[in-house]
Amino acid sequence: MLVAVGSGSNVDDPDTHPEEKNRADILEFNPDGGDPSIYAYGIRNAGGGIAFSPETGELWCSVNERDGLGDNLVPDYITHVQQGGFYGWPWWYMGGHQDPRHEGKHPELKDKVITPDVILHPHNASLELTFYNGKQFPEEYQGDIFAAEHGSWNRSVRVGYEVIRVPLHQTGHATGEYEDFMTGFVVDNGHVWGRPVGVTVAQDGSLLVTDDGSKSIWRVSYTGK
């Protein structure tokens, strides 16, 4: 069993904050109930969404990154997860970019930081993801990722507040591209009336989206072009 455990803070250093031990990790538990092992680490908060690709069997996650570096840092992301991989938190991000709040710490980790597959807007607050395996949408949607973007709370211009589609082109692999799929939760004056949280495929092949802004569950159905 794999469990995503978010960090207990924004960027507290586990070296000096022992309460961060085994946080910002994806942990692997065995049925015997023994101590967990670390499947991947340095993932600040993937608690919103982990799922296995039906095409490749790989684990994927959507990640809420850290705050406090302005509007344009640090990007949230969606990525397949390499077992044993390090994704940067809290010292590094997006490959070899060091968080200035931890300048000079852990230089030995710089070249180990994995760059994610799909880079999103900073503060998008990417939550649950799912792979489309229904029969209602067109064939080109098969195996693609849908992800709920809860929306920013600390950015001067709002981002997120939508469901995005990550095309995997029936290969199970991302190219870095993504597209808006379900939008309209931000009105012209910048006010927000909906915030997507969860997304799943219904038995009839439609897409169900939970929204804690309007306290609704939306059904997205395909009726033809």
What are these regions (language model features)?
Residues 66, 214-215:
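Loop/turn residues immediately N-terminal
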